Amino acid sequence: MDSFFADVSEFQAPVSDSYPYKILSIRVCDGTHQDSNFAQNYAWMRNALDSGRLDCGIVYTYVRPNWQDNANTVRQMIDANGGLHPRVVLMLDVESGGNPGGDGSAWINALYNNLAEYAGNPARIIGYANQGDFNTMWLSRPKGLRVIAASYGSNPLLPGQIAHQYTDGAYG
């Protein structure tokens, strides 16, 4: 069974009632940069979760080495917009673009631990990256971490993988 969902940030139009899927992923921030559509997207997500329109929400942050400021931004933005909904998971978007090279496990895991404490359960924190970034940036990952793998050519079947992001060349 396939489950489809979109990744929505300030680079796309805000989510609306035309959204067709049962899962939605929205960006809260890129480090300390606050996504300009987060409040609107999160309000829609919360209402859709409460009404049964959505089954699950994913709120993600593009991780940056200033992990404490990154964590504070995530917490403050969610708290300012109704708090963490019980059917929302937080996702760490781990990508090499704009981040220092090499193993970032120390600061990524510090962010993970901070947000796991905030969420009340480490199972509510998932990771996202392509195989190369997982293997170079996040060498030491928390035990039991579930991940979404970004791979457009083939399914990489990463340890803990729960989803595979790909493209079929179409867009809506």
Question: Predicted regions: what is each one?
Answer:
Residues M1-S18, W138-G172:
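Functionally critical loop-and-helix segments that line ligand-binding/catalytic clefts
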Residues T32, P65, D133, N155, ...:
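Surface-exposed, flexible loop/turn segments at secondary-structure boundaries
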Residues Q40, I58-Y60, I126, H164, ...:
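Intrinsically disordered, low-complexity segments enriched in small/polar residues
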Residues Y62, D93, Y128-N130, A150-Y152, ...:
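Conserved beta-strand termini and adjacent loop/short-helix elements that scaffold enzyme active sites
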Residues C56, G120-T136, R146:
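Aromatic-lined carbohydrate-recognition surfaces of secreted/lumenal glycan-active proteins
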Residues M1-P122:
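Substrate-binding cleft of extracellular glycoside hydrolase catalytic domains
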